[in-house]
Curated annotation (Swiss-Prot):
Organism name: Neisseria meningitidis serogroup B (strain ATCC BAA-335 / MC58)
Coarse class of the protein's main subcellular location: cytoplasm
Domain DPCK residues, every copy: 4-202
Gene: coaE
GO CC terms of this entry: cytoplasm
This protein's name: Dephospho-CoA kinase
Entry-linked InterPro entries: Depp_CoAkinase, P-loop_NTPase
Length: 210
């Protein structure tokens, strides 16, 4: 039976880079954001309900979701954000669970869930939580470099996410990603050895058990 580690962290912490390091070591990887994207891609099963709730203005003339428009709408309104989450979160949960069922031989796998701290229903899908942490200034710099967002825009996103202390309280393990990619790879290799050992002998190891 494959045991699942939930990998989480704030924007710019290096979640995806860490998850890729694990994947490079042969660890099964599931990405909640990728699942969400597939659900809202062309002919995605979430689209009819999104259209019903948000209207035609969030779609282009080809029927594709205008993600930028929808993102602005939900970012500006907590009630609209909650409405979108009521559609998306159950579908993402089901998609992750379906993907998990395709892996049975690996000792453990990684599920990348950015909002794990905020959306605790996903805890039931995992046995252990790995939080990727980084200094705020590094996080802001990384996001600005890759996205073109201003410092203020990145800071606004961070302010809407769970705090670092909240993530650390949830964590079984913490990886501090404050250096180079080489350093990140070395840290994930050590965690890989640790997880391979504990899950081979104690598959329920961790504080997030059924």
């Amino acid at each position: 039976m494959t045991v699942w580690v939930g990998l989480t962290g704030g924007i710019g912490s290096g979640k995806s880079a860490a998850a890729q390091c694990f994947a490079d070591l042969g660890v099964p990887r599931i990405d909640a954001d990728a699942a969400a994207h597939s659900l809202t891609a062309s002919d995605g099963i979430a689209l009819p309900e999104i259209r019903r709730l948000f209207g035609d203005t969030v779609f282009d003339t080809q029927g594709l979701l205008r993600r930028d428009i929808l993102r602005k709408e939900v970012f500006a309104s907590p009630s609209r954000k909650a409405l979108l989450e009521s559609v998306m979160l159950p579908l993402i949960f089901s998609e992750i669970k379906k993907q998990q069922e395709t892996f049975t031989d690996a000792a453990y796998g990684i599920v990348e869930i950015p909002l794990l701290t905020e959306k605790r229903q996903f805890i039931s899908l995992i046995r252990r939580v790995l939080t990727i942490s980084a200094p705020v200034e590094k996080r802001i710099g990384r996001v600005m470099a890759r996205s073109g967002l201003t410092r203020g825009e990145v800071a606004a996103v961070i302010s809407h996410q769970a705090s670092e202390s909240e993530r650390l309280l949830l964590a079984d393990d913490v990886l501090l990603n404050d250096g180079s990619l080489k350093s990140l790879r070395e840290k994930t290799m050590r965690l890989h050895a640790f997880y391979s050992g504990i899950f081979a002998s104690k598959p329920t190891q961790g504080k997030h058990n059924d």
